[in-house]
Design a protein with these regions (language model features):
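N-terminal beta1-alpha1-beta2 module of alpha/beta enzyme domains
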Residues: 1-92, 215-218
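Acidic (Asp/Glu)-rich catalytic clusters
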Residues: 2-4, 44-48, 86-94, 120-126, ...
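An alpha-helical appendage that flanks or caps ligand/catalytic pockets
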Residues: 2-18, 152-215, 245-306
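Hydrophobic faces of well-ordered beta-strands that scaffold small-molecule active sites
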Residues: 7-11, 54-56, 96-102, 125-131, ...
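Conserved, mostly hydrophobic/aromatic
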Residues: 9, 46, 50, 89, ...
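Active-site mouth loops of central-metabolism enzymes
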Residues: 22-37, 101-110, 146-152, 214-227, ...
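Hydrophobic or amphipathic alpha-helical targeting/insertion segments
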Residues: 92, 97-143, 149-152, 157-161
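Long, repeat-rich segments with strong aromatic
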Residues: 229-239, 244-245
Length: 306
């Protein structure tokens, strides 16, 4: 009897919906983007449905170029920092994975290592890091840059960034902390490893002042579809958000990415590739279609022209 493959399911979530008009529904909860109790309720409901992970949408910037237009469809204009949010959600859930984005273009490796190791401890081994290099100059301007560095340069930096973070997570071996009170030894020095990294982009001595994350390494997500992005994913990722405007394109992306893994010493089964679908929810099909029609009819011309 052949074994059945398990489909990986997750929820990517924006509090007022991904459609620019979703917030206009009378049932939309106005304060949801900054209401942690709302998120806890939503994720507990999701957990009851047995998905594998929850992933809040994020971008580290407000759109400032045309506020009069963005007020019509304010996607990403009001949202909490995702790692902090997931830490609050962790205590209200028990088994759903908790994923967040942190950009290798804007963070420092030591900070990312600490943040996701902490989330992994808080959630008892449910953290996931979505590794991105970012794609928008408007976000770069919040981090001392006029514009993003060139694409290939960003990915070279991302590779080094990832190696540092993974090395910091390996500062301590799993059984390094022994708490031997009789001999006054909290940890075994032989199981403490200083990274002492010096590379093209970063100089990080280490090590991480936190016990090894419960998973060893939090789950690694990526979404890059460029050549550099696919190379990094084939080398490092465990889950990739796939692309493709058609079934044939999705199949080609799947085969391409899986086919790159052998040169990095990895088996294709070590990587899951997920396709995205936007869902309009209603008590029945008619209600869902009416909701979709309402959204479409209420797309403001200012948003359509952005």
């Amino acid at each position: 009897m052949s074994s059945r493959k398990k489909m990986v399911l997750g929820g990517l979530f924006e509090a007022n919906g991904y459609h620019s008009s979703a917030w206009l529904l009378p049932s939309a909860q106005d304060r949801a983007p900054t209401d942690v109790d709302y998120f806890r309720r939503i994720v507990r409901m999701a957990e009851d449905g047995q998905p594998d992970f929850f992933f809040p949408a994020d971008t580290p910037a407000a759109r400032t170029e045309n506020p009069d237009a963005w007020t019509r469809g304010p996607l990403y204009m009001n949202m909490m920092e995702p790692i902090t949010l997931l830490s609050a959600i962790a205590g209200a859930t028990s088994h759903i994975g908790l994923g967040a984005t942190a950009s290798t273009s804007f963070y420092e490796p030591y900070n990312v290592a600490r943040l996701f190791a902490s989330l992994d401890h808080i959630s008892h081994g449910r953290a996931a890091w979505n590794v991105v290099t970012s794609a928008n100059d408007y976000a770069a301007r919040n981090f001392g840059l006029d514009r993003l560095p060139p694409h290939d340069r960003r990915y070279a930096k991302a590779r080094e960034f990832f190696e540092i973070v993974r090395g910091l997570w390996d500062t301590w071996e799993d059984d390094a902390f022994i708490y031997d009170k009789a001999n006054v030894r909290m940890f075994d020095p032989e199981k403490f490893h200083v990274l002492d990294h010096e590379g093209e982009f970063f100089k990080v001595h280490g090590g991480l002042n936190m016990a090894r994350p419960p998973q060893g390494s939090p789950v690694i997500f990526q979404a890059g579809a460029s050549e550099a992005g696919k190379e990094l994913a084939a080398e490092t990722a465990e889950v990739v958000f796939g692309t493709g405007a058609s079934r044939d394109e999705a199949i080609q992306f799947y085969r391409d990415l899986k086919g790159r893994m052998a040169k990095f010493g990895r088996h294709p089964d070590e990587l899951k590739i997920l396709s995205g679908v936007s869902i309009v929810v209603g008590e029945n099909e008619q209600q869902a279609r009416e909701k979709w029609a309402f959204w479409q009819e209420n797309v403001h011309i200012d948003i359509g022209l952005l």
